[in-house]
Amino acid sequence: MDGLVAPAPIPHGPPVRGTLFYKMTGSGNDFVVLDGRATTPERWAAARVRAICDRRTGVGADGLVILTPAAAGTVRMSYWNSDGSHGAMCGNAALCSGRLAVELEMVPAGEFCLLTDAGMVRVLSQGPADDAEINLPDVDLPRDGPELEPASGEHWISLGAVGVPHLVVRVDDIETVDVPSRGKALRSDPALGPAGSNVNFVSPQSDMRAPWLIRTFERGVEAETLACGTGTVAAGLALAARREAGLPVTFRSRGGPELTVRAQVGASRAHDVWLRGQGRRLFRGVWEDQEDGR
């Protein structure tokens, strides 16, 4: 990416009591992000993650991220869902992490790596337009969902994994889908095993040149979220595998800003997989709880 402009470093104020956090969003998928130089993943048990992610009594978020500098040009991204469960990977969290790691001067602007539990993710840091691009590990193309029968208005169901498992459901009209109900039923379908899966519903618009529409029921949040990065990648690969869309393909979620997927698709695997989308810092604050000695 030529012409990148590094965001200005965030000024450091006086010492604070508690944990300094950054609230970020990727297409409406929101996160609390912490600097791992000031805290450690070991201090964030499930109950504490749930507390800070609670939308009524905490900061409110779909997930928690801790960024920790590792080897040169590498940042460790630890991720938890809002229910306190650990997540191997989150695409929108990676986009947000790519921006904040540069702002916190963990790495210089340009290209660097995020180390996740789903593998190494290359990041192209964004300019001032609040966007970033991530290069994901090669993945198998989504396949027909095992023993999952499409309901009325559904064309097909595919199952894939982009760091975490994803169902992709092609529907006639995404606005008529009861995402909380249908998503919850598919997420815990016995055919998927005890871990279940995220569920993504996709439909085209009347203008086939317009972005595809996508809505997601997220495992670990156990609700519909405004966007899902890895789910968007799974959807793009499923559509490409069925030749319903060419790559790159762009999606619009309920969160607003678009996400674009590009990849090289072979007979059974996708290579050079990229996701481009928003990574925006909303505000920062201080979280005080019993762990901080309040």
Residue ranges and their predicted role:
Residues 2-128, 168-294:
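A glycine-rich beta-to-alpha transition motif near the start of alpha/beta enzyme domains, typified by
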Residues 138-157, 184:
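Active-site glycine-rich loop that binds ribose-phosphate moieties when present
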Residues 27, 139, 165:
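Short glycine-rich anion-binding loops that position phosphate/pyrophosphate groups of nucleotides
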Residues 149-178:
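Internal active-site segments that recognize and position negatively charged phosphoryl groups
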